[in-house]
Structure formats: C-alpha cells, structure tokens
Amino acid sequence: MVSLMKLWIPMLMTFFCTVLLSVLGEMRKKRYDRKELLLEECWGKPNVKECTNKCSKAFRCKDKNYTCCWTYCGNICWINVETSGDY
C-alpha cells in the first residue's frame, strides 16, 4: 500500500504542475483584435539593411514612426513610402 502511494504522489504533483503552468500561460497571452493583425503591403523597395528590421510576433514595431508591413523579404518595420509608379 505504501509503495503504491509513493508512485501516485509524484504523478499527481506532475499533473497539477503541468495543468497550472498551462493555465497561467494562457492567462498571460494578450488577445488582439482582428484589425490589429492585418498587415499592409510595403509600397516601395526596401534595401537589405531595411529587411533586417523585423516585426515582432504580434506585428508590432519598437519605434512608433514605423509600421509593420510585408515585403518580399518578410514582415518588416518600415516607413511606408508611396512609389511613383515605376513598376
């Protein structure tokens, strides 16, 4: 009987710890509006240096003057510049 209890205690502790960690992790996530997750296309041709300035996973930029948009090099933080029609 005692040996059976020795097996169940670590299993129960592991179960409760994993359940609590998953619940606390879910509470920490911030919910974003659907409009916040929509990306615009970057109008212009970013160079290699600008392609290294990546957005966060929540499509946010560190600098408020920049917006997260998508290009051929991925999602980058960039000041959108309208092109003059040189396609």
From Swiss-Prot:
Keyword line: Secreted, Signal
Compartments, record wording: Secreted
Signal peptide: 1-25
GO CC aspect terms: extracellular space
A GO molecular-function descriptor: serine-type endopeptidase inhibitor activity
GO process annotations (BP): antibacterial humoral response; innate immune response
Additional record remark: Although this protein was isolated in a region containing several WAP proteins and was defined as a WAP protein, it does not contain a classical WAP domain.
Name the UniProt record assigns to this protein: Protein WFDC11
Natural source organism: Homo sapiens (Human)
